[in-house]
UniProtKB/Swiss-Prot annotation:
It holds the Pfam family Ribosomal_L25p. The keyword Cytoplasm does not apply. This is Large ribosomal subunit protein bL25. The lineage of its organism: Bacteria, Pseudomonadati, Pseudomonadota, Gammaproteobacteria, Candidatus Pseudothioglobaceae. Signal peptide: none annotated.
Amino acid sequence: MNLTINALTRNYQGKGANRRLRRNNKIPAIVYGTGKPPSKITLDIFEITHLLKNEETYTSVLNLIVNKNKEAVIIKNLQRHPAKNSITHIDFLRINLNQSIITSIPIQFNGEEDNKAMRLGAVLNQFMTAIEISCLPTNLPHSINVDISHLTIGEHINLTDINIPKGIVITALTHGDIETHNQSIAIIQEPRKMAEIEENILVKAEDSKNKITKDNETNKDKSNL
């Protein structure tokens, strides 16, 4: 996929300047990496919003053109307004196409319709939604596909069970002791088990709330002494 983003350098910074940019349908951004100084830029809100409608934009190598100069980048961080969900700022990371990069890629679970246990009412409990990987930019996948069609009730799928494409490394499994870092990413569970887990979470939250209230009352009593 060949995706291009046009940008202009900006000389002003700060909350006031950024608000003025957004009022004029521009988004503040920054690009850094490969040993070069960071560069503050502005993006057209309509262009970047259109590109981000395609989920693959988040995990693709992008052509960033700043004042007619082209650089290869990936989106490193994207900030949104907490209430409006509109884009407020983007960080781009410059990359060398001949050097490996480390980034997080979303997990795509496949085979739910073919899973016998799930057809009978079992549910998939996900522990992870993304995996940190290392690879050359040219090998960067848009998602990590995980087949769960064969899983039975109570069966986990771990990092080492994932069929990773050639040229891609799961960083968690490069720290020496694979057994220690071989995390479970999902399990097939009975609906009853899921309900018990949710109930336990609620009970723990309530216990924690009661403890805080009790501690506050104790501290209040002490302050009156």
